[in-house]
């Protein structure tokens, strides 16, 4: 992460104000099968969910430390809303209007990319399907 945001080989590669950290579709099952990862989690008394939260918060801290605004997928909010900084921008893609309302009411800013209407690999849809999205 340090290389991507500044001070490393990739410095300047992502020069914008915002940095999307991802955080969706994380499969933590493999963490339970790797001995050194299991030992690391046990030493910190973390479950796989806790380790995921630890990692997410470390990444968000690094992004903020470089003066950037962090964007994270909706799953980060879903699993870690109590621990992530309120200045994290949540990128909503799975949810509906109710999810949007909850995220905003919890004090987060939101980018809406509802997959039902904005998942562009659905090339069989016509332009009016996308244009008529009224989340």
Task: Describe these PLM feature segments.
Residues 98-135:
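Aromatic-lined glycan-binding groove of carbohydrate-active enzymes
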Residues 1-88, 93-109:
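Active-site neighborhood of glycoside hydrolase catalytic domains
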